[in-house]
Protein backbone atom coordinates (compact mmCIF):
# COMPACT_ATOMS: atom_id res chain seq x y z
CA UNK A 1 0.00 0.00 0.00
CA UNK A 2 1.88 3.04 -1.31
CA UNK A 3 1.92 6.25 0.73
CA UNK A 4 -0.10 9.18 -0.65
CA UNK A 5 1.43 12.37 0.83
CA UNK A 6 -1.59 14.64 0.33
CA UNK A 7 -3.86 12.13 2.05
CA UNK A 8 -1.48 11.94 4.99
CA UNK A 9 -1.23 15.74 5.19
CA UNK A 10 -5.00 16.27 5.09
CA UNK A 11 -5.57 13.49 7.64
CA UNK A 12 -3.14 15.06 10.10
CA UNK A 13 -5.33 18.13 10.68
CA UNK A 14 -8.79 16.58 10.60
CA UNK A 15 -10.93 16.84 13.75
CA UNK A 16 -11.56 13.66 15.76
CA UNK A 17 -14.02 11.22 14.21
CA UNK A 18 -16.04 8.28 15.50
CA UNK A 19 -14.84 4.75 14.76
CA UNK A 20 -17.14 4.32 11.76
CA UNK A 21 -16.05 7.49 10.01
CA UNK A 22 -12.41 6.84 10.91
CA UNK A 23 -12.57 3.45 9.16
CA UNK A 24 -14.31 4.70 6.01
CA UNK A 25 -11.96 7.66 5.72
CA UNK A 26 -8.82 5.53 6.08
CA UNK A 27 -10.02 3.10 3.42
CA UNK A 28 -12.06 5.08 0.88
CA UNK A 29 -10.38 8.45 1.49
CA UNK A 30 -7.06 6.90 0.70
CA UNK A 31 -8.51 5.28 -2.44
CA UNK A 32 -9.79 8.65 -3.63
CA UNK A 33 -6.44 10.29 -2.90
CA UNK A 34 -4.58 7.62 -4.84
CA UNK A 35 -6.89 7.96 -7.84
CA UNK A 36 -6.53 11.73 -8.00
CA UNK A 37 -2.76 11.52 -7.56
CA UNK A 38 -2.41 9.03 -10.42
CA UNK A 39 -4.81 11.02 -12.62
CA UNK A 40 -2.63 14.12 -12.25
CA UNK A 41 -5.12 16.36 -10.45
CA UNK A 42 -3.68 19.71 -9.31
CA UNK A 43 -2.75 19.55 -5.63
CA UNK A 44 -5.29 22.18 -4.56
CA UNK A 45 -8.03 20.22 -6.33
CA UNK A 46 -6.93 17.03 -4.59
CA UNK A 47 -7.23 18.71 -1.19
CA UNK A 48 -10.61 20.20 -2.09
CA UNK A 49 -12.03 16.86 -3.22
CA UNK A 50 -10.59 14.99 -0.25
CA UNK A 51 -12.26 17.41 2.15
CA UNK A 52 -15.54 17.00 0.27
CA UNK A 53 -15.18 13.24 0.53
CA UNK A 54 -14.37 13.34 4.24
CA UNK A 55 -17.21 15.62 5.32
CA UNK A 56 -19.91 15.01 2.66
CA UNK A 57 -19.48 11.34 1.73
CA UNK A 58 -17.83 9.41 4.57
CA UNK A 59 -20.56 10.22 7.17
CA UNK A 60 -23.13 8.63 4.83
CA UNK A 61 -21.42 5.23 4.56
CA UNK A 62 -22.91 3.86 7.76
CA UNK A 63 -21.36 1.56 10.36
CA UNK A 64 -17.91 0.20 9.67
CA UNK A 65 -17.75 -3.52 8.79
CA UNK A 66 -17.46 -5.95 11.68
CA UNK A 67 -17.30 -9.07 9.52
CA UNK A 68 -17.13 -9.98 5.85
CA UNK A 69 -20.95 -9.95 5.66
CA UNK A 70 -22.67 -6.57 5.14
CA UNK A 71 -25.38 -5.57 7.60
CA UNK A 72 -27.18 -3.99 4.63
CA UNK A 73 -26.40 -5.11 1.09
CA UNK A 74 -26.16 -1.98 -1.01
CA UNK A 75 -27.06 -1.92 -4.68
CA UNK A 76 -23.93 0.04 -5.55
CA UNK A 77 -21.67 -1.83 -7.96
CA UNK A 78 -24.27 -4.28 -9.22
CA UNK A 79 -23.74 -8.03 -9.21
CA UNK A 80 -19.96 -7.75 -8.97
CA UNK A 81 -20.05 -5.87 -5.67
CA UNK A 82 -19.98 -7.21 -2.11
CA UNK A 83 -22.65 -4.95 -0.60
CA UNK A 84 -20.34 -2.01 0.11
CA UNK A 85 -22.20 1.34 -0.18
CA UNK A 86 -19.54 2.97 -2.40
CA UNK A 87 -17.72 2.27 -5.65
CA UNK A 88 -15.58 4.29 -8.04
CA UNK A 89 -15.17 5.11 -11.70
CA UNK A 90 -12.17 6.20 -13.74
CA UNK A 91 -13.00 7.91 -17.02
CA UNK A 92 -9.89 7.61 -19.13
CA UNK A 93 -8.50 10.80 -20.51
CA UNK A 94 -8.17 11.81 -24.13
CA UNK A 95 -5.45 13.70 -25.93
CA UNK A 96 -6.79 16.97 -24.49
CA UNK A 97 -8.43 15.81 -21.24
CA UNK A 98 -7.13 14.28 -18.04
CA UNK A 99 -8.92 11.32 -16.43
CA UNK A 100 -12.06 12.10 -14.43
CA UNK A 101 -12.76 10.48 -11.05
CA UNK A 102 -16.24 9.71 -9.71
CA UNK A 103 -17.74 7.80 -6.85
CA UNK A 104 -21.21 6.35 -6.44
CA UNK A 105 -22.82 5.86 -3.05
CA UNK A 106 -26.00 4.64 -1.47
CA UNK A 107 -26.28 6.84 1.62
CA UNK A 108 -27.03 4.91 4.80
CA UNK A 109 -28.71 6.47 7.81
CA UNK A 110 -30.45 5.71 11.08
CA UNK A 111 -33.59 4.48 9.30
CA UNK A 112 -31.84 2.36 6.65
CA UNK A 113 -32.91 -1.29 6.68
CA UNK A 114 -35.92 -0.56 8.91
CA UNK A 115 -39.65 -0.60 8.26
CA UNK A 116 -39.63 3.20 8.65
CA UNK A 117 -37.68 3.55 5.41
CA UNK A 118 -38.10 0.38 3.31
CA UNK A 119 -36.85 2.06 0.12
CA UNK A 120 -33.86 3.70 1.84
CA UNK A 121 -34.84 7.18 0.67
CA UNK A 122 -34.43 9.29 3.79
CA UNK A 123 -30.64 9.45 3.99
CA UNK A 124 -30.29 10.00 0.24
CA UNK A 125 -32.79 12.85 0.07
CA UNK A 126 -31.20 14.48 3.11
CA UNK A 127 -27.78 14.25 1.47
CA UNK A 128 -29.04 15.70 -1.82
CA UNK A 129 -30.68 18.56 0.05
CA UNK A 130 -27.40 19.21 1.86
CA UNK A 131 -25.53 19.25 -1.47
CA UNK A 132 -28.01 21.78 -2.86
CA UNK A 133 -27.29 24.04 0.14
CA UNK A 134 -23.48 23.75 0.00
CA UNK A 135 -22.59 23.22 -3.69
CA UNK A 136 -23.53 26.29 -5.79
CA UNK A 137 -23.86 24.32 -9.03
CA UNK A 138 -26.31 21.75 -7.64
CA UNK A 139 -29.95 22.31 -8.55
CA UNK A 140 -32.53 19.71 -7.53
CA UNK A 141 -35.54 21.10 -9.40
CA UNK A 142 -35.58 18.25 -11.92
CA UNK A 143 -34.91 15.58 -9.29
CA UNK A 144 -37.66 16.75 -6.93
CA UNK A 145 -40.05 16.79 -9.90
CA UNK A 146 -39.10 13.35 -11.21
CA UNK A 147 -38.79 11.51 -7.87
CA UNK A 148 -42.52 11.33 -6.96
CA UNK A 149 -43.24 9.65 -10.30
CA UNK A 150 -40.90 6.79 -9.33
CA UNK A 151 -42.29 6.15 -5.85
CA UNK A 152 -44.65 3.17 -5.61
CA UNK A 153 -48.24 4.07 -4.92
CA UNK A 154 -49.74 2.83 -1.67
CA UNK A 155 -49.62 -0.96 -1.72
CA UNK A 156 -50.18 -3.80 0.71
CA UNK A 157 -47.70 -4.14 3.57
CA UNK A 158 -46.73 -7.66 2.49
CA UNK A 159 -45.98 -6.44 -1.04
CA UNK A 160 -43.92 -3.53 0.28
CA UNK A 161 -41.80 -5.95 2.30
CA UNK A 162 -41.03 -7.87 -0.90
CA UNK A 163 -40.10 -4.66 -2.72
CA UNK A 164 -37.91 -3.22 0.05
CA UNK A 165 -34.44 -2.17 -1.03
CA UNK A 166 -32.46 0.61 -2.65
CA UNK A 167 -34.50 3.10 -4.67
CA UNK A 168 -31.95 5.95 -4.92
CA UNK A 169 -28.20 6.28 -5.45
CA UNK A 170 -25.96 9.35 -5.74
CA UNK A 171 -22.97 9.94 -7.99
CA UNK A 172 -20.33 12.65 -7.48
CA UNK A 173 -17.99 13.62 -10.32
CA UNK A 174 -14.82 15.50 -9.42
CA UNK A 175 -13.29 16.88 -12.59
CA UNK A 176 -9.60 17.83 -12.36
CA UNK A 177 -9.96 21.26 -13.97
CA UNK A 178 -13.03 22.47 -12.11
CA UNK A 179 -13.86 23.75 -8.65
CA UNK A 180 -17.33 22.23 -8.61
CA UNK A 181 -18.61 18.78 -7.67
CA UNK A 182 -21.15 17.53 -10.21
CA UNK A 183 -23.94 15.46 -8.66
CA UNK A 184 -26.14 12.84 -10.28
CA UNK A 185 -29.09 10.96 -8.81
CA UNK A 186 -30.21 7.49 -9.86
CA UNK A 187 -33.78 6.30 -9.32
CA UNK A 188 -34.98 2.69 -9.24
CA UNK A 189 -38.74 2.02 -9.45
CA UNK A 190 -39.43 -0.95 -7.18
CA UNK A 191 -42.81 -1.99 -8.62
CA UNK A 192 -42.46 -4.01 -11.88
CA UNK A 193 -45.51 -2.37 -13.44
CA UNK A 194 -43.80 1.01 -13.10
CA UNK A 195 -40.91 -0.16 -15.26
CA UNK A 196 -43.25 -1.21 -18.05
CA UNK A 197 -44.89 2.25 -17.95
CA UNK A 198 -41.63 4.18 -17.95
CA UNK A 199 -41.57 5.27 -21.61
CA UNK A 200 -45.30 5.59 -22.13
CA UNK A 201 -46.50 7.27 -18.94
CA UNK A 202 -43.98 7.99 -16.19
CA UNK A 203 -41.21 9.78 -18.10
CA UNK A 204 -43.45 11.79 -20.46
CA UNK A 205 -45.45 13.11 -17.51
CA UNK A 206 -42.35 13.76 -15.40
CA UNK A 207 -40.73 15.67 -18.26
CA UNK A 208 -43.86 17.76 -18.83
CA UNK A 209 -44.01 18.54 -15.12
CA UNK A 210 -40.34 19.54 -15.12
CA UNK A 211 -39.99 21.38 -18.43
CA UNK A 212 -43.55 22.46 -19.20
CA UNK A 213 -46.39 21.02 -21.27
CA UNK A 214 -44.76 22.07 -24.55
CA UNK A 215 -41.47 20.22 -23.89
CA UNK A 216 -40.05 18.45 -26.94
CA UNK A 217 -40.22 14.68 -26.40
CA UNK A 218 -38.67 13.69 -29.74
CA UNK A 219 -35.67 11.98 -28.15
CA UNK A 220 -37.81 10.06 -25.66
CA UNK A 221 -40.31 9.10 -28.35
CA UNK A 222 -37.46 7.87 -30.52
CA UNK A 223 -36.35 5.48 -27.77
CA UNK A 224 -39.91 4.16 -27.43
CA UNK A 225 -40.24 3.65 -31.19
CA UNK A 226 -36.79 2.07 -31.42
CA UNK A 227 -37.65 -0.42 -28.66
CA UNK A 228 -41.03 -1.33 -30.14
CA UNK A 229 -40.50 -1.21 -33.92
CA UNK A 230 -36.83 -1.77 -34.73
CA UNK A 231 -35.92 -5.50 -35.03
CA UNK A 232 -32.77 -4.96 -32.95
CA UNK A 233 -34.27 -2.43 -30.56
CA UNK A 234 -37.19 -4.78 -29.84
CA UNK A 235 -34.74 -7.05 -28.04
CA UNK A 236 -33.98 -4.42 -25.40
CA UNK A 237 -35.59 -4.62 -21.96
CA UNK A 238 -36.07 -1.66 -19.64
CA UNK A 239 -34.43 -2.06 -16.23
CA UNK A 240 -36.29 0.90 -14.74
CA UNK A 241 -33.08 2.60 -13.66
CA UNK A 242 -33.08 6.29 -14.53
CA UNK A 243 -30.26 8.77 -13.98
CA UNK A 244 -30.69 12.52 -13.76
CA UNK A 245 -28.20 15.38 -13.53
CA UNK A 246 -28.67 17.60 -10.49
CA UNK A 247 -27.96 20.86 -12.30
CA UNK A 248 -29.82 23.72 -13.97
CA UNK A 249 -32.93 22.41 -15.68
CA UNK A 250 -31.84 23.47 -19.17
CA UNK A 251 -28.65 21.40 -18.83
CA UNK A 252 -30.19 18.32 -17.22
CA UNK A 253 -29.89 14.98 -18.99
CA UNK A 254 -32.10 11.97 -18.31
CA UNK A 255 -30.49 8.55 -18.70
CA UNK A 256 -32.65 5.49 -19.35
CA UNK A 257 -31.00 2.12 -18.73
CA UNK A 258 -31.82 -1.03 -20.69
CA UNK A 259 -30.35 -4.51 -21.16
CA UNK A 260 -30.20 -7.07 -23.93
CA UNK A 261 -29.48 -10.79 -23.83
CA UNK A 262 -28.33 -10.86 -27.44
CA UNK A 263 -24.53 -10.93 -27.22
CA UNK A 264 -23.64 -10.94 -30.92
CA UNK A 265 -21.48 -8.01 -31.89
CA UNK A 266 -23.74 -7.18 -34.84
CA UNK A 267 -26.55 -6.60 -32.35
CA UNK A 268 -24.33 -4.51 -30.07
CA UNK A 269 -23.32 -2.36 -33.05
CA UNK A 270 -26.95 -1.92 -34.10
CA UNK A 271 -27.87 -0.58 -30.66
CA UNK A 272 -24.87 1.74 -30.40
CA UNK A 273 -25.66 3.20 -33.85
CA UNK A 274 -29.44 3.31 -33.19
CA UNK A 275 -30.05 1.05 -36.16
CA UNK A 276 -27.79 3.13 -38.38
CA UNK A 277 -29.32 6.47 -37.46
CA UNK A 278 -26.15 7.47 -35.59
CA UNK A 279 -23.42 6.35 -37.98
CA UNK A 280 -20.05 5.31 -36.54
CA UNK A 281 -16.97 4.87 -38.69
CA UNK A 282 -15.85 1.36 -39.60
CA UNK A 283 -12.58 2.06 -37.82
CA UNK A 284 -14.30 2.81 -34.51
CA UNK A 285 -16.66 -0.14 -34.87
CA UNK A 286 -13.59 -2.30 -35.46
CA UNK A 287 -12.00 -0.96 -32.29
CA UNK A 288 -15.19 -1.59 -30.32
CA UNK A 289 -15.44 -5.13 -31.69
CA UNK A 290 -11.85 -5.95 -30.78
CA UNK A 291 -12.38 -4.61 -27.26
CA UNK A 292 -15.69 -6.46 -26.89
CA UNK A 293 -14.14 -9.79 -27.94
CA UNK A 294 -11.10 -9.37 -25.71
CA UNK A 295 -12.98 -8.31 -22.58
CA UNK A 296 -15.51 -11.11 -23.05
CA UNK A 297 -12.87 -13.76 -23.77
CA UNK A 298 -14.40 -14.55 -27.16
CA UNK A 299 -12.31 -16.32 -29.82
CA UNK A 300 -11.20 -13.96 -32.56
CA UNK A 301 -12.71 -16.23 -35.22
CA UNK A 302 -16.22 -16.00 -33.72
CA UNK A 303 -18.49 -14.50 -36.43
CA UNK A 304 -19.92 -11.13 -35.45
CA UNK A 305 -23.42 -12.53 -35.97
CA UNK A 306 -22.91 -15.30 -33.39
CA UNK A 307 -23.68 -15.22 -29.67
CA UNK A 308 -20.87 -15.31 -27.12
CA UNK A 309 -20.16 -18.77 -25.67
CA UNK A 310 -22.19 -19.36 -22.51
CA UNK A 311 -20.02 -19.51 -19.40
CA UNK A 312 -20.42 -22.20 -16.74
CA UNK A 313 -20.14 -21.40 -13.04
CA UNK A 314 -18.07 -23.60 -10.69
CA UNK A 315 -21.30 -25.27 -9.50
CA UNK A 316 -22.15 -26.27 -13.07
CA UNK A 317 -24.95 -23.75 -13.62
CA UNK A 318 -24.94 -21.38 -16.57
CA UNK A 319 -23.78 -17.81 -16.12
CA UNK A 320 -26.25 -15.65 -18.09
CA UNK A 321 -24.75 -12.77 -20.03
CA UNK A 322 -26.60 -9.47 -20.32
CA UNK A 323 -25.40 -6.29 -21.97
CA UNK A 324 -26.51 -2.97 -20.44
CA UNK A 325 -26.86 0.32 -22.32
CA UNK A 326 -28.22 3.72 -21.52
CA UNK A 327 -29.97 6.28 -23.70
CA UNK A 328 -29.14 9.89 -22.87
CA UNK A 329 -32.32 11.96 -23.30
CA UNK A 330 -32.23 15.74 -23.70
CA UNK A 331 -35.28 17.75 -24.79
CA UNK A 332 -33.22 19.89 -27.15
CA UNK A 333 -31.89 16.87 -29.09
CA UNK A 334 -33.85 14.76 -31.57
CA UNK A 335 -31.76 11.62 -31.03
CA UNK A 336 -30.38 10.21 -27.78
CA UNK A 337 -26.73 9.49 -27.15
CA UNK A 338 -25.94 5.84 -26.41
CA UNK A 339 -23.44 4.22 -24.08
CA UNK A 340 -22.71 0.48 -23.90
CA UNK A 341 -21.53 -1.34 -20.78
CA UNK A 342 -19.26 -4.37 -20.91
CA UNK A 343 -19.75 -6.48 -17.79
CA UNK A 344 -16.40 -8.05 -16.93
CA UNK A 345 -17.59 -9.54 -13.63
CA UNK A 346 -19.11 -12.49 -15.53
CA UNK A 347 -16.33 -12.76 -18.11
CA UNK A 348 -13.83 -15.65 -18.13
CA UNK A 349 -11.09 -13.02 -18.45
CA UNK A 350 -9.37 -12.11 -15.17
CA UNK A 351 -9.74 -8.60 -13.81
CA UNK A 352 -6.07 -7.89 -14.43
CA UNK A 353 -6.22 -9.21 -18.01
CA UNK A 354 -9.29 -7.06 -18.68
CA UNK A 355 -7.59 -3.95 -17.29
CA UNK A 356 -4.45 -4.63 -19.33
CA UNK A 357 -6.55 -5.10 -22.47
CA UNK A 358 -8.17 -1.68 -22.06
CA UNK A 359 -4.86 0.03 -21.33
CA UNK A 360 -3.21 -1.62 -24.34
CA UNK A 361 -6.13 -0.53 -26.53
CA UNK A 362 -5.71 3.08 -25.39
CA UNK A 363 -1.96 2.99 -25.95
CA UNK A 364 -2.33 1.36 -29.36
CA UNK A 365 -4.73 4.05 -30.56
CA UNK A 366 -2.99 6.99 -28.93
CA UNK A 367 -5.87 7.72 -26.57
CA UNK A 368 -5.65 8.97 -23.03
CA UNK A 369 -2.89 10.49 -20.99
CA UNK A 370 -0.76 7.88 -19.25
CA UNK A 371 -3.44 5.15 -19.12
CA UNK A 372 -1.11 2.96 -17.06
CA UNK A 373 -1.80 5.23 -14.10
CA UNK A 374 -5.14 3.39 -13.94
CA UNK A 375 -3.31 0.10 -13.43
CA UNK A 376 -1.42 1.65 -10.54
CA UNK A 377 -4.75 2.49 -8.91
CA UNK A 378 -6.19 -1.00 -9.33
CA UNK A 379 -3.04 -2.67 -8.01
CA UNK A 380 -3.00 -0.35 -5.03
CA UNK A 381 -6.62 -1.08 -4.10
CA UNK A 382 -6.50 -4.82 -4.81
CA UNK A 383 -3.34 -7.00 -4.71
CA UNK A 384 -2.12 -8.24 -8.08
CA UNK A 385 -2.55 -11.90 -7.15
CA UNK A 386 -6.24 -11.26 -6.43
CA UNK A 387 -6.69 -9.36 -9.69
CA UNK A 388 -5.18 -12.37 -11.47
CA UNK A 389 -7.15 -15.10 -9.74
CA UNK A 390 -10.39 -13.65 -8.35
CA UNK A 391 -13.34 -11.65 -9.67
CA UNK A 392 -15.09 -8.72 -8.04
CA UNK A 393 -12.69 -5.79 -8.27
CA UNK A 394 -13.93 -4.77 -11.73
CA UNK A 395 -17.62 -4.33 -12.48
CA UNK A 396 -18.01 -2.75 -15.94
CA UNK A 397 -16.32 -0.83 -18.68
CA UNK A 398 -18.57 1.66 -20.43
CA UNK A 399 -17.92 2.72 -24.01
CA UNK A 400 -19.35 5.64 -25.96
CA UNK A 401 -18.21 7.44 -29.10
CA UNK A 402 -17.07 11.01 -28.47
CA UNK A 403 -15.18 13.20 -30.93
CA UNK A 404 -14.36 10.28 -33.21
CA UNK A 405 -12.77 8.12 -30.52
CA UNK A 406 -13.92 5.61 -27.94
CA UNK A 407 -14.65 7.23 -24.60
CA UNK A 408 -14.01 4.50 -22.00
CA UNK A 409 -14.80 4.47 -18.29
CA UNK A 410 -13.95 1.77 -15.75
CA UNK A 411 -16.26 1.05 -12.80
CA UNK A 412 -14.63 -0.80 -9.91
CA UNK A 413 -15.27 -1.81 -6.33
CA UNK A 414 -13.28 -1.30 -3.12
CA UNK A 415 -14.47 -4.74 -1.88
CA UNK A 416 -14.55 -3.51 1.70
CA UNK A 417 -16.49 -6.56 2.90
CA UNK A 418 -14.87 -9.15 0.67
CA UNK A 419 -11.44 -7.93 1.76
CA UNK A 420 -12.49 -7.30 5.37
CA UNK A 421 -9.69 -9.28 6.99
CA UNK A 422 -7.08 -7.70 4.69
CA UNK A 423 -8.31 -4.23 5.66
CA UNK A 424 -8.07 -5.17 9.32
CA UNK A 425 -4.42 -6.08 8.85
CA UNK A 426 -3.66 -2.89 6.91
CA UNK A 427 -5.38 -0.60 9.40
CA UNK A 428 -4.54 -2.32 12.67
CA UNK A 429 -1.38 -4.27 11.95
CA UNK A 430 -2.87 -7.64 12.85
CA UNK A 431 -5.72 -9.90 11.90
CA UNK A 432 -8.57 -9.73 14.36
CA UNK A 433 -11.29 -12.30 14.76
CA UNK A 434 -14.76 -11.22 13.71
CA UNK A 435 -15.94 -12.50 17.06
CA UNK A 436 -13.90 -10.01 19.11
Swiss-Prot record:
GO molecular function: prenyltransferase activity
UniProt KW keywords: Transferase
Family: Belongs to the tryptophan dimethylallyltransferase family.
InterPro entries: Aro_prenylTrfase, Aro_prenylTrfase_DMATS
Pathways involved: Secondary metabolite biosynthesis
GO biological process: alkaloid metabolic process
Protein name (record): Prenyltransferase nscD
EC number: 2.5.1.-
Lineage, uppermost ranks: Eukaryota, Fungi, Dikarya, Ascomycota, Pezizomycotina
CDD domains: PT-DMATS_CymD
Function, in words: Prenyltransferase; part of the gene cluster that mediates the biosynthesis of neosartoricin B, a prenylated anthracenone that probably exhibits T-cell antiproliferative activity, suggestive of a physiological role as an immunosuppressive agent. The non-reducing polyketide synthase nscA probably synthesizes and cyclizes the decaketide backbone. The hydrolase nscB then mediates the product release through hydrolysis followed by spontaneous decarboxylation. The prenyltransferase nscD catalyzes the addition of the dimethylallyl group to the aromatic C5.
Enzyme class: transferase
Keyword Transferase among record annotations: yes
Amino acid sequence: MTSVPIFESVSRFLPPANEDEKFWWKVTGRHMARMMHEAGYPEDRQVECLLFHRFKVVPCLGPRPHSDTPWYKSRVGGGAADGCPINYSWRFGTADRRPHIRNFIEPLGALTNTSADPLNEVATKALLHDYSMTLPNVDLEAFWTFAPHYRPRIIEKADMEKLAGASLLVGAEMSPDSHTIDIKAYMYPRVPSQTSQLLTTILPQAMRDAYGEDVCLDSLNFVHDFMTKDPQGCQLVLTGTTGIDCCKLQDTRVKIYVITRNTSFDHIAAIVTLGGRRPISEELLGQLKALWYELKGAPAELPSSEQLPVQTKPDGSKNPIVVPFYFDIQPRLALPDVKAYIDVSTSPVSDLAAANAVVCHLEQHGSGQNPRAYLNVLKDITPVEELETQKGALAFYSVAVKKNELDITSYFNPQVYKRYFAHEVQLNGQRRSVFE
